[in-house]
Every structure is written in structure tokens, then in C-alpha cells.
Amino acid sequence: MYIKRHLETTIEKLSGCCKVLLVTGPRQVGKTTLLRRLAEGNRTYVTMDDINVRSLAMTEPGLFLQRYKPPLLIDEIQMAPKLLPYIKMYVDEHGNNGDFWLTGSHAFDLMENVTESLAGRIAIVHLLGFSHAEVAGLGAGAFVPEEKFLLQRAQEAEILPMRDLFEQIWRGSMPALNNASEQDWNNYYSSYVQTFLQRDVRTLTQVNDELQFYRFLCAAASYTGSMINYAALAKEAEITAPTAKQWLKVLAAAGLVYLLEPFMHPNLKYGVKAPKVYFTDTGLAAYLLRWSNAEILEAGAMSSSFLETWAVMEIYKSFSNCGQIPPLGYYRDFNSREVELVLNVDGSIHPLAIRKSSSPVKEIKKFDILRPVTEGERALKLGAGGVICFANDLLPIDARNWYIPAGLL
């Protein structure tokens, strides 16, 4: 059964006003399936995985565009970068919006080539795995914890018990694993990691020892939901700190991790500056850390980190699926007081705590560390916030903050 992706509306809108559309994202998140469904047979499909097609695109790009005429869907465009300047010449000559739909992995070289060749002509959107809202059939929309949005979401969403939510967290967001068995889960991620090591890692960086990079990948998974410490990560992976920093950028370029930068403001003078790292798919992180089922993960030492990772990525997807750059940050001061998520939207900041509890009553007191941003020339409003938790219902904490059941994300 096809599950409607929230990015569909954004793609149709952008395709109507831009000559080229690029959908990026990690392997196997459904980029091709999404675009082929939207095309409905009305555009030619070619994939650069086909060596004959790729050879033509790389050796005779002009002839390629004579053979495959727009409207055209080109899969894995990063494998044929020489085609991009010819796409530019074609769209400049013909000027039709939506002539080219492209998919590609979110890699350094791809984005650099696209930016150079198609600047001003291309719209770029990013697709990750299924969101909870997509699987549950909820409406699309950027998650901002304001009363109208929360009340609407509470009417359409179910309150998930902790066990059910951790089943979703453990299973992950890959479309191929929707309703899969535990054995399928293990086999899938084993193959996924092997493919990533053999194909993507070699493309993105010079790594001679796949086993060493695998150790790094597992070590990085242990940091999901945590502020990154490159020296400690490097020691655990038995590499140097500069290498750890570079390899983490590789994971980010491949779309496997998201680096959440600290929220910065001139009035906040004592905040840490290191990013936090989140695996974009909690199932992959669980596999790398050998959490063999949801029950063990829920009871394990990293359950809170996995809940935070899941919540942050759900909110991230809610923005990116609307075609917006997610306005996310976090704030932690030198006294270790932390607001897990700060949304900076339309001149207001929305603080969010994330807790594996049903009624974490003291969490909103930490939001006071953000009050200095409401003063001075660059003042921001302190907007609605809340605690994402396992409350039995959407409930107000005070005039501005809410207990937000995790199932409403």
C-alpha cells in the first residue's frame, strides 16, 4: 500500500514554478517511488544505475537529451555530473517549468555541481524516511507548538502508549520496513550498511579500511541525541579527532545524521557552541548499537536519547516536507541547563523539552534561561512551548506551555 508523502504538495508546487526539481536524501527513503507516482507515466524515466544510460550521459550528454526528451525524470543524477551543464542549456533555451525532475544522494559533489550549473533554475527539496504523521495519516504542516495547531492535531491523532512508540522508534522510518518482521529488519539494515560502506563511503571520502569506518559509524550512533565531543568519538573509533570531524561530515552529506547547531543570540553569552548529532533514522542507530527489539531499547540506557532523536527528526521532517529549512536549534549553558529544542519562527522562539515521562512538571523552568532574548534591539518574542512526553492528553501547563503527547508529532 502506498503511503502518501507530505512532500508531494511541495513538489507539485515547486515544479510549477521552477525549470528543474531535485529531490535529495539518503538511500532507500522513497525518492524514486515518490516522483514516479507523481509523474503518473507522463514523463520519461531513466536511471543512471543503468551503465549504458550512464555511459551515454557522460560521454555524449547532448545526444542523451536528444534520445530522452523532457519532461524527464533522471534517477541518481550524481552519477552523471557532466549532464548538468547540458540541462542548463536546455532549460535556458526552452524555458518550460518542470521539464526535469532529478533524484540524488545528498553528497558534497552533487550539491556543488548543482549549485554551479543550475543556480537560479533549480528547486531542491530533501526527503527522509516516513514521518509518524505520514504513517498515521495525519495532515501535513510544520510543527509549531501553538494552540491552534496542537488542538487540531489532538483531534486527528491517537495518543500512543510508550511501548507502541518505542516499537516505531526501533523499527525506524525506512519505507521497506513498514510492517516488516524482526528478521526482515535485521537483514535489511545489514544490507543497507554494507551498501553504504561499499558505495557511498568510497564516493564521499578516501577510506581504505571499511572496517575502521564501520567502527566509527557504530561509535557515532552511540552519540545520537548528544552533544558531540570529537576527541571522545575519535578515541572510541580509534581514529584522530580531525578524521572524526571529517567523517561525521560525510555522514551528514549522505543524509544519515543531522547536526543540530546551538541557538545563538547576542544576549545569550554563556551557551555552548558544539552541535548535537541525531541519526535521521532511529532504526539504523538501533541496528548499529545492537538493540535487538523494541522492548530492550525501551528499557535500555539510551531510551531517552532515542526518544529525543525521534522527536527532533519528526519536527525536522514536518518543516522539510513543507519545503522549509527547519529553523531548529538547541540551547545549553555552561551550567548544563539545556532546552532540547528551540524553534525560531517569525520572530518568536518556541522552547521544547523532550522527556520519557508522563508529567515532567519541572521542565519548563529551564525555559527561563532564554528570557534574555526578549530584550534589546534584536529582541525576539518568547512564544508557545511545551514538553514532549507521554502525557495521556494534550494539557496546558500554564498560559504559554503544554504537555504534548509524543504521538501528536
Predicted regions and their residues:
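Conserved alpha-helical scaffold flanking the Walker A/P-loop in AAA+ ATPase domains
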Residues: 54-72
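Short regulatory helix/loop adjacent to the ATP-binding pocket of P-loop NTPases
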Residues: 108-124, 136-141
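A short beta-strand-to-loop transition that corresponds to the Sensor-1 phosphate-sensing loop
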Residues: 103-107, 113, 128-130, 388-392
